[in-house]
Amino acid sequence: MIYDVAIIGAGVSGASAAWQLSQYECSTILLERWADVGFGVSKANSGIVHGGFHHPVSSLKARLEIQGNLMFEKLQYELDFPFSRCGILVIAFSEEQMVTVRKLYEQGIANGVRNLEMCGRERLLELEPKLNSEVVGGFFAPNGGTIEPYRYVFSLVEGAGRNGVELLCNYEVTSGRHNGEYWLITAADGREIKARHVVNAAGLFADEISRKFGAEEFTIHPRKGEEYLLDRNSQARPERVIFPVPSKESKGVLVIPTAEGTTMIGPTADPVDDKLDTTTSADHMQRIVSLVRQMVNGITPRDVITSFAGLRPVLDTEDFYIDRSEKVPHFIQVAGIQSPGLTASPAIGEYVKDLLKTDGLMLVEKTRVIRKLPPRREIRRETPEGLAGLHAANPRWIHVVCRCENISEAEIVEAIHKGHTTVDGIKFYTRAGMGRCQGGFCTAKILKIISRETGIPMEELTKKGGNSRLLAGRLENTVVAPMPEK
């Protein structure tokens, strides 16, 4: 089969393009190098829907950010992912910082952002009582918010799949060759896909994919951001996303009330050489906690329950690169999608669709499109009456597997049947393992459920695919944990 479009990379950009294309009469396949979608850049970021004031409208990233911001209510209604338009506060603690605050406010106004509000100290404390009382001023962007990025990607891909888009995970592209009619896309394991048009949405590896297809030469510079998750009961949780005055390299260390009720602080912004370097450090944690204490009241190091790091795919221009290739035919570049890429992603999907149309792809709207996913059932959101009804239909609904986040066996099974068969895939789909104990109580139970539902032996199950096995093997009838590396 020759597909009309092959999208390389199933993160927010590739998944958004797939969702757009799924509404047209064209055959599309989504190729992902990792074991599940969203396992690259998209799984580890701040989860913020930005407010359209950080970048000048002359940049592509600003234009798509502003457009994408306005698309989330409709998407959330259709695709059922956690999203909260809680608003953003940008705060200053000196008159010197207020100069930058005013510039950002004026830039937002120039960009066409509505309802921005300059605030004095009293108004800021009214909007967010947990702010440090020494705050001088700032502004409020009510159109900002938060989103759960991995659930967002899962929903986009599920929605696209229900409308005919195919998905191949564990498909690491090693070469692309055009024969005058179509692209032959080869994977590391020898599999081949044929497609008339290719979209390069490969995140950190977009530069490598571009070279493998003979397209433009550019370099992705990984910039690491460490994030720290606070206990759900932390006294430091604000009602709004809190931004400090930004630097040239970063929007600063933020305090983020996540869409699912936890609190996150970070990120850092450190250039690294290794595109797979997701290590975190105690020194960075202490520095971030110290910076956050200057912004909000109530945080202590004991609140931190885990850390993680993500890598931003940065181009020398610090802007997005989304365009048709000028070197090879029918090849669309979607590269350098760092912040505010998550916010811009719905608009990126539309932008890519329009580029493909310009590139010669015939796009005829389908007469029937499944636009709305069935609503998710989650016991932590059910009424007693609703839970009783679920239990009557399936006893697994009252078997709690993850106590910290209140996740039932039925929810785990649903995730598995939707293709999430790694521990991280289950975690990102259901939140099992994201609470205070970080999987200490539920991981063994989850492994047993995955094995039961898939038939895969427990010792072959992985945390995130590849060689990330959690168990070393069996001793008679006992599963043995691997020895720690020295």
Predicted segments with their positions:
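C-terminal catalytic lobe of FAD-dependent flavoproteins
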Residues: 250, 259-260, 271, 276-401, ...
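Iron-sulfur (Fe-S) cluster-binding segments and ferredoxin-like electron-carrier domains
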Residues: 408-419, 441-459
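Helical element adjacent to the flavin cofactor pocket in flavoenzyme catalytic cores
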Residues: 139-197
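Dinucleotide-binding Rossmann-like beta1-alpha1 core, especially the glycine-rich loop
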Residues: 47-127, 252-253
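Short beta-strand to alpha-helix junction loop
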Residues: 56, 63-66, 91-100, 139-158, ...
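Glycine-rich FAD pyrophosphate-binding loop
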Residues: 23-44
